[in-house]
A protein has these predicted regions:
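Short linear motifs at protein or domain termini
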Residues: 1-99, 222-236
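Structured catalytic/translocation cores of nucleotide/phosphate-coupled proteins
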Residues: 7, 30-33, 168, 195, ...
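Short helix-capping and inter-helix turn/linker motifs at the boundaries of alpha-helical repeat units
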Residues: 7, 61, 133, 180-181
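Juxtamembrane helix-loop transition sites at the ends of transmembrane segments
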Residues: 45, 82, 169-172, 216-219
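Conserved amphipathic alpha-helical segments that form helical-bundle/coiled-coil interaction surfaces
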Residues: 101-172, 184-193, 201-211, 215
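Solvent-exposed loop and edge beta-strand segments that line ligand/cofactor-binding
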Residues: 175-179
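Short, charge-rich amphipathic alpha-helical segments embedded
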Residues: 211-225
Length: 236
């Protein structure tokens, strides 16, 4: 059983992460350890531990003599580069997964899809703490399970290093809009190809899903350009 200090550190980390994702601490905002400790009614120690974890997830950055600051949103070019990297990893990963995936993994994938569908029915759009966190985690589980089934640790490690669901999830928090139902449709196409052990179809379904995801992000950026500008400047 975790000790009290470990539980407290984990709780502080989750609270700070939630505030970053919900734009309470907007991109570019400085994070002062003493001020955070007062705000969250804890000592500086769990704050430092939480900051270290958040920095590892690239949600915040640290500069010598300047301290911590909430990381900026990805630029348009970086979003494109991130999605390109995903395609390089996940498309071939899906092709391999279709070859290797076993019934227990297929059952797990199907259960995740059902939970995503259930979450999408009552998620409060735009709120990390009221539903989207669960949806985001389930979507992450879906993609990671496929790469796990690909039976290539290097592909899985490369995917995890991208920190995809945190980076892209922050955009949905800004725009307070997402199309979960369409995501479910795209996931179903991937699942059916995996279940049929059709590598080419699985690769094509993942390619289509990632392309659609990128288009959704850029549509939101085009629709809410002022929101991106405001957040980038760290305004509330």
């Amino acid at each position: 059983m975790p000790d009290q200090k470990t539980v407290l550190a984990a709780s502080v980390y989750e609270r700070m992460k939630e505030r970053i994702m919900d734009q309470y601490y907007p991109p570019g905002e400085r994070l002062n350890i003493d001020a955070l400790a007062i705000d969250l009614a804890v000592s500086p120690t769990p704050i430092r531990e939480a900051l270290a974890r958040l920095a590892a997830e690239r949600l915040i950055t640290f500069e010598a003599y300047k301290g911590y600051r909430v990381s900026p949103l990805l630029t348009l070019e970086q979003v494109h580069d991130l999605m390109h990297a995903r395609r390089l990893i996940e498309v071939d990963g899906a092709r391999l997964a279709a070859k290797h995936i076993m019934l227990p993994d297929l059952i797990t994938v199907e259960k995740i899809m059902q939970r995503i569908l259930d979450e999408s029915a009552h998620t409060e759009v735009g709120s990390w703490s009221h539903g989207y966190r669960q949806f985001n985690q389930l979507d992450k589980d879906f993609h990671e399970l496929i790469l796990t089934a690909a039976d290539n640790l290097f592909l899985l490690g490369a995917y995890r290093s991208l920190n995809v669901h945190i980076e892209l999830g922050r955009f949905y928090q800004v725009f307070q809009e997402m199309d979960q139902q369409q995501t479910c449709v795209e996931h179903d196409a991937i699942f059916r190809a995996l279940k049929a052990h059709n590598g080419d179809a699985a690769a094509a379904a993942v390619e289509a899903h990632l392309h659609a995801t990128e288009e959704r992000i850029f549509r939101l950026i085009d629709k809410y350009p002022h929101a991106v500008t405001a957040v980038a400047k760290g305004t509330r």
